[in-house]
UniProtKB/Swiss-Prot annotation:
Its EC number is 1.5.1.5, 3.5.4.9. GO terms for cellular component: cytosol. InterPro entries: Aminoacid_DH-like_N_sf, NAD(P)-bd_dom_sf, THF_DH/CycHdrlase, THF_DH/CycHdrlase_cat_dom, THF_DH/CycHdrlase_CS, THF_DH/CycHdrlase_NAD-bd_dom. Belongs to the tetrahydrofolate dehydrogenase/cyclohydrolase family. It comes from Rhizobium meliloti (strain 1021). PROSITE patterns: THF_DHG_CYH_2. This is Bifunctional protein FolD 1. The gene is folD1. SUPFAM superfamilies: Aminoacid dehydrogenase-like, N-terminal domain, NAD(P)-binding Rossmann-fold domains. Catalyzes the oxidation of 5,10-methylenetetrahydrofolate to 5,10-methenyltetrahydrofolate and then the hydrolysis of 5,10-methenyltetrahydrofolate to 10-formyltetrahydrofolate. Homodimer. Pathway: One-carbon metabolism; tetrahydrofolate interconversion.
Length: 306
């Protein structure tokens, strides 16, 4: 029988532990976890994401500040704000919502964030620690970290003998996801737009993780029976059954046809999405504890690392 992984429920358990960890931090140090979120421009999707992150930060009891900047903000102005937040001892995490307007150099901004405050896990220092197998002293990119929680819940901490396929090679997800799987002893294949005969490669995988932005690309006849399927895609497709010009969210996996063949599968929405925000909150409270020379509770550590 297929297990439909409930991302909202898993995220809720982690968020509860984060709230407790923040309360313990405040009791020991007199300070809350401080998270600053920066958004530039008026993209509706970005504002929706930032709103969800800010609300969750407040639910966790954080000191949360949102900086909403106009689209015309210059590189110098944005860099100045990041510099100011880097120097603020009350801010433990800095998140710059991507994408930025085209005239801004996003990579330069991300790399200007102090690594210990880079709660998105995108700084080269954090990426480098992950690449060398250091999962303890850096901050791990949120979506791969959330997907890995699901994998561990199904397969445990040691993935020895399992074949894992990551479809997508982005710096934001595909590469860090592959590193996490490698660190857990899986045999990892990364597929991408130049991969030939992807379906046959997929049929050999015990774990399939799709993150390419192609609606319902992974079909049932691609899957090995009993595979674990983690769908990271978020795509809007026409939904005429809902009315004119209406859309619905789907992932990169054809969920309805793939679910009967999988042992465990994440839905879209309600799968990886809630976990991304939960892992952002986890990184923030971890950063706050480290800034005070403390470690987070064993309960939270077990929930996020298995």
């Amino acid at each position: 029988m297929t297990t439909i992984i409930d991302g909202k429920a898993v995220a809720a358990s982690i968020n509860g532990a984060i709230k407790d960890a923040n309360a313990e931090l405040q009791e020991q140090t007199g300070r809350k976890t401080g998270l600053s979120v920066i958004i530039v421009g008026d993209d509706p999707a970005s504002h929706a994401y930032v709103g969800a992150k800010s609300r969750m930060a407040k639910e966790c009891g954080f000191f949360s500040v949102q900086h909403t900047l106009p689209k015309e903000t210059t590189q110098q102005e944005l860099a100045g704000l990041v510099h100011q937040l880097n120097a603020d001892d009350g801010i433990h995490g800095i998140l710059v919502q991507l994408p930025l307007p085209e005239h801004l150099d996003a990579d330069a901004i991300i790399q200007s964030i102090r690594p210990e405050k880079d709660v998105d896990g995108l700084h080269v220092a954090n990426a480098g620690k992950l690449a060398t197998g250091d999962l303890e002293s850096g901050l791990i990119s949120c979506t791969p970290a959330g997907a890995m929680v699901f994998v561990r819940r199904v397969h445990g901490r040691d993935l020895s003998g399992l074949n894992a396929l990551v479809i997508g090679r982005s710096n934001l997800f595909g590469k860090p996801m592959a590193q996490l799987l490698l660190n857990a002893n899986a045999t990892v294949t990364i597929a991408h737009s130049r991969t030939s005969d992807l379906a046959s490669i997929c049929r050999n995988a015990d774990i399939v993780i799709a993150a390419v932005g192609r609606p319902e690309m992974v079909k049932a006849n691609w899957l090995k029976t009993g595979a674990t399927v983690i769908d990271v895609g978020i795509n809007r497709v026409p939904a005429p059954e809902k009315g004119e010009n209406r859309t619905r969210l789907v992932g990169d996996v054809a969920f309805a046809e793939c679910a009967p063949f999988a042992s465990a599968i994440t839905p879209v929405p309600g799968g990886v999405g809630p976990m991304t925000i939960a892992m952002l909150m986890a990184n923030s409270v971890i950063a706050a504890h480290r800034a005070s020379g403390l470690k987070v509770s064993e309960r939270l550590s077990k929930l996020i690392s298995g």
